[in-house]
Amino acid sequence: PGSDRYSRAADDLGKWMNEGVLTQDEKPAIYYYTQTYTEKDGSKHTRKGFIGLSRLVDFGKGIHPHERTLSGPKADRLQLMQACDANMSCIFTLYSDPALRVNKLLEGAIAGKAPDIDVTDDDGIVNKIWRVDDKQTLSGVIESMSDKSLFIADGHHRYETALNYRNMMREKAGNFTGEEPFNFIMMYFSNMDDEGMTIWPTHRVVHSLKSFDADSFLASCKEYFDLKEFA
């Protein structure tokens, strides 16, 4: 066993692969992933998307961020990536496809097939995944996504870390083709135009601000927001 959490993570990953807990599919594939969840009003929604590889590009060249990042989390994720030589979780991206072409292609490919994974998590969300590996569907999805802009919904630190890792590996390799694994990253792609896509608020707690007056701040907020006191 390693002496720190990064080497221990690499040891665990290697053990899972050796024991067959994690296996590599024989054929190239993408993975259609749906999540069915219930809102507080009782309404049910199903978010649809797929997991696949995306080529790493600098921001503004087809992939766009919406938040700034911190150096600490990026350093942590880089150490994990260097130790494991793997993507440990998907970057969550949104794309626009009002015609739902990609979803229709994937739903056609899985019609009548049981999911490869069907599990309800601790939050009551029903997660289902189907492996899609027929060449016609894969080609259709790739073609449909070729001109799409991607917007990172979650994973800014991991994406920037992957860019840094790619650059380090390119410098180390000297010569590279651009098709090496380090030029790509695992992503979850979801259509922002699908009815299953909903946006919930994110609650942040801010503390230790100097000269902060809550009453004055709330009074200023009333000019731009509708405020509701909960506690």
PLM region spans:
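Surface-exposed, charge/polar-rich loops and edge strands
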Residues: 1-231
